[in-house]
Amino acid sequence: MSIENKNTGVKKVVLAYSGGLDTSAIIPWLKENYDNCEIIAFCADVGQGEEELIGLTEKALASGASECHIVDLKEEFVKDYIYPTMATGAIYEGTYLLGTSMARPIIAKAQVEVARKVGADALCHGCTGKGNDQVRFEGCFAALAPDLKVIAPWREWTMQSREDLLAYLAERNIKTSASATKIYSRDANAFHISHEGGELEDPWNEPSKGVWTLTADPEDAPNQAEYVSLEVENGRVTKVNGEALTPYAALMKLNAIAAPHGVGRIDITENRLVGMKSRGCYETPGGTVMFAALRAIEELVLDKTSRNWREQVGAQMAHLVYDGRWFTPLCKSLLAASESLAESVNGEVVVKLYKGHAIAVKKRSPNSLYSEAFATFGEDQVYDQKHAEGFIRLYSLASRIRALNAK
């Protein structure tokens, strides 16, 4: 199950390590195929849950790693990646809030930082050769550490299945809690959890209740709606129900409030970067509430041209994030440009949560361009409706000229 030794002078490798079956097998495989190089395991804590980190260091060392670095990125992830992305209005193919995609650049950056710290000359990831993540990670590595060799075992070794990996570890007396039966492939962070594989590979199959792990089934959610208040400053949620919170804490509180109401579930078939389509079920409870609140305030404060521009930026940004182009000049420019609009996104929103829905039902902002006096359908003293006639004649002038020329 090994390959011909492909060592090209690699002495120390930093592996993006999760403790799962794949990365547990990668550690001994690297030693065998890269001249017994030193393996440094690296795990990014992006809010996937404490249970995922318990015993991780011991497991990495038992598999053959010399060190294991667990880096807490939760606050930075929300503050510097999730919030800026949401400020652009990015949403991939009209539905996906990019939970997995946003996590990849910060993980890759931290992995490079660990590599620099320990003096490594190579980076390794456990992404398959069919997915988006291989491109995302290696694109970030190219931008941040083009001098470091990148090793992608799934594109090199001959193992094809979980059974192969389990047999490989058993041959080397490396213990694992994994089993041959794994129904779904899941990826979690503070923002969301994704589910792929199993019955989901057939788009004619409705996801079973066992797919979802974070949110309640909307059918089983409370019959009584719950209202949650969000206060926003410069496009960032700063308070939830009147309580001042850090970015990460605000997201966690919204997750806890929205998940029991079944908020944030989507089932989509998306276009992968590598060309194929894939089906995924995503749960993003707190992020869905945040997105609804930010859009509600934008409705009040952005004029027509600004909102149109933001929508264009959001569409472009969604593809950049999804395609792993975070560390590019265009991404940097779009993020910076969006900040100027975010300066006016201030106010308070009340979101109603009910059986899978998150609807902004109240909103106010000190920067609001909405004027009840101008918008009213009743009698008013500030807007003379006769003024609209001249505007309409000028607005439709091109159409009028075109029609006259056609006669």
Curated annotation (Swiss-Prot):
Binding site for L-citrulline: 96, 101, 132, 136, 185, 194, 270, 282
Top-rank taxon: Bacteria
Positions of ATP binding: 16-24, 44, 126
GO cellular component terms, A-Z: cytoplasm
Residues holding L-aspartate: 128, 132-133
UniProt family annotation: Belongs to the argininosuccinate synthase family. Type 1 subfamily.
InterPro entries assigned: Arginosuc_syn_C (IPR048268), Arginosuc_syn_N (IPR048267), Arginosuc_synth (IPR001518), Arginosuc_synth_CS (IPR018223), Arginosuc_synth_type_1_subfam (IPR023434), AS_cat/multimer_dom_body (IPR024074), Rossmann-like_a/b/a_fold (IPR014729)
The name this protein goes by in its record: Argininosuccinate synthase
E.C. designation(s): 6.3.4.5
GO molecular function: argininosuccinate synthase activity; ATP binding
Subunit structure: Homotetramer.
Organism: Shewanella oneidensis (strain ATCC 700550 / JCM 31522 / CIP 106686 / LMG 19005 / NCIMB 14063 / MR-1)
Alphabetized UniProt keyword annotations: Amino-acid biosynthesis, Arginine biosynthesis, ATP-binding, Cytoplasm, Ligase, Nucleotide-binding
